[in-house]
Amino acid sequence: MKYNNILNVDGVFADLGVSSHQFDSSKRGFSIRFDSEIDMRMNTNSSFDAKEILNEYSENQLSNIFFEYADLRNSKDIAKTIVDARSLGKIKRTSQLNEILSSFLPKGFENKILAKVYQALRIEVNQEIEALKEVLLQLPSLVKKGGTISFITYHSIEDRIVKRFIQNGCFNSEPSKNEFGVSEIPFKKTFKFIAPSLKEVKSNNRARSAKLRSAIKI
């Protein structure tokens, strides 16, 4: 925008996460439905992919991303199992990973647990949390007074970040304050959040976890 001499905007709308096109691709490793190479790069020009995480990260690093990016309480056990498995040979395909994790998949919840693991890997590969925070931090100076920001989130990790930024103007649990001790909160929420209706979820199951949060620049 700076190239086109656009310094401020009336609003920003962001639909976060992975596109249906990426989930439906049988060659990128985004989905648990296909047996494919574990890639997960949104930017295919990047040399860093999910295979590198699975085969090169330490047990502690793996545990951290599964805990931080997937809320998996047994992240340490999952990490240890992956490290043990890769000692027998590199983990390259989704079918391998799914089999390695089979002992952590209670009947009826297999897809839910696998989806969380894949989510954590994808977030780490694409540095999604860092990118989201970078965007949010630019908004106070980018959006005009009275302008609107709206974000659709699809999982609790990114939703917590957006919610906290709208509430506090930062990513901490308390608002940032200026030198006089006055809270500096650049946005005011317009509503709590909007979730999809049962009718919408029925017609588009991928919308089931979506939340829309919106705020006005003050």
Language model region names:
Residues 1-218:
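S-adenosyl-L-methionine-dependent methyltransferase catalytic core, i.e., the SAM/SAH-binding region
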